[in-house]
Amino acid sequence: MLDRMASGVTQLFPLWAVIVGILSLYEPSYFLWYGKDAIGVGLGIIMLGMGMTLEFTDFWRVWKEPKLIGMGVVSQFLIMPAWGAFLAWSMSLPSEMAVGLILVASCPGGTASNVVVFLAKANVALSVSLTMASTLLAIFLTPWLTNLYAGHYLAIDGWALLKSILLIVLFPVFLGLLWKRVFEKSARLVSRVSPLISVLFILLIVGYVLAAKRDIILGYWSTLLTAVIFLHFGGFFLGYIVGVLFKRDQSECRTFAIEVGMQNSGLGMALASRHFSHLPMVQTPCALSAVVHCLIGSLLAFWWNHKK
């Protein structure tokens, strides 16, 4: 019963993201109670839950198919940051908005991608492996890529970003792995509802950031929305093309598209709120990204499911 309820709510995540996005802009008071300081805590809990769903042996899966995993991870960190930087330059985005767009483009694949891959009837095992690999590599690549592409807009403290990611990502994931090893029964129980908990915290983070930055979003909505839509649409398209060029099967092509096109927007929001709190516009592309990539991903999943 619990598993079925958690699974049902989790699979409707794209719908909840859109609803929360609309509600947070229409009635900000519904989400403003969450608070900026809770963003990092929420993401840490999500990563802890992710760690509890993994085994140390799962990491060997990456080495069993290095070419496939390598293709996905290289595409993730090569395509999205460069594409985000190109959009920021070509659209002449304000400096703060440009940094926010590049920051979220430099983040790893998000756990929501695993849900969308499942809905699209693509390769879920590959999706989980890619998310895990890109999340671990992001500890070093996200700060470096953000500094590389956005450093000329604003001063970026790459070391501070690195320390935050270690605290928010690596430590909770490793703690979750240890917990599962030592307290297997309790970890198994928690892992049954961890996808549901992850969805709830992501929705709270998205709702809070959109509500807190409502005036900025409404003031720049056309520019913001255009930039974020192009970012993710390009990611989905180019990710799919990578699979086609390397002659992968349809299931793997769809998985690459979703993994490249969907980012860990929660990590982007956590880093933006921690390191650019004095620059409110930096957080807005990250928050809007969570809604946009879920919407595009779910529409693609629906289309692929009904494609003959």
Regions found by a protein language model. Give the residues of each.
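Alpha-helical transmembrane segments of multi-pass small-molecule/ion transporters
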Residues: 1-308
